[in-house]
Amino acid sequence: MTSRERVLAHLEGRPVDRLPLMPITMMFAAVQTGARYRDYCTDYRVLVEGQIRTAEAFGFDYVNTMSDPAREAADCGAPVEYFESQPVALIEDQALLADKTKLASLKIPDPLGGGRMHNGIKALALFKERVGKDKIIEGWIEGPIAEGADLRGINTLMMDFFDDPPFVHDLFAFVIELELRFAREQLKAGADVIGVGDAAASLVGPDIYHEFVWPYEKKLVDGIHALGGKVRLHIC
């Protein structure tokens, strides 16, 4: 049973020879090649090499394009900071939507427009070429509250839930459209599964989660399923 067969069978509830092994690796994968993590985040060829080497060395059943949470925000125009040996970071005190009125004029970037999203899509195409017959290929997008926080600033967004609920709904609706466009191109490029990172959901209580976050996570997952993709939701 190949890794690909194992994961697909398990997802469909069929017997497998062992449970699939699909741990998230980012900086660990870069270490396997001796690459700077900055290069892992910005050069799809470095990411692909690190993922494949890690999967082969440790018996993983998949490869993954996750490197940091800033791909989509950077392409939207958000200021980000690059480091030699840690993930790309959003600069919260310069948040793109510090002025929330800018949301009305914010354009969704083209995932194939040569930016960081495009870099991730190129990684998927290379994964498909190199290991597509054997491994499951997982793309990555940000969830509604995670990307909303990347664009607005996490601390400001937490106050928006109380101070301006309609804005939060508008922001999350924008995020869902952005992420579904990105997911569509990732699936076309070769992704079998779309991972959704929505870590900021763990920072709110159940009332806020059910009113604001859950409905948009559901729309996002349903949208990816409608595109023919499988979904893995990651809330760390």
Language-model segments: which ranges?
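Active-site loop segments of alpha/beta catalytic cores
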Residues: 1-31, 35-40, 50, 54, ...
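A contiguous, mid-domain pocket- or channel-lining segment that forms the substrate-recognition surface
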Residues: 80
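Acidic/polar active-site rim loop that often engages polyanionic ligands
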Residues: 98-108
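Membrane helical hairpin/interfacial module
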Residues: 58-73, 77
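Loop-to-helix transition at the N-terminal end of transmembrane alpha-helices
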Residues: 44-48
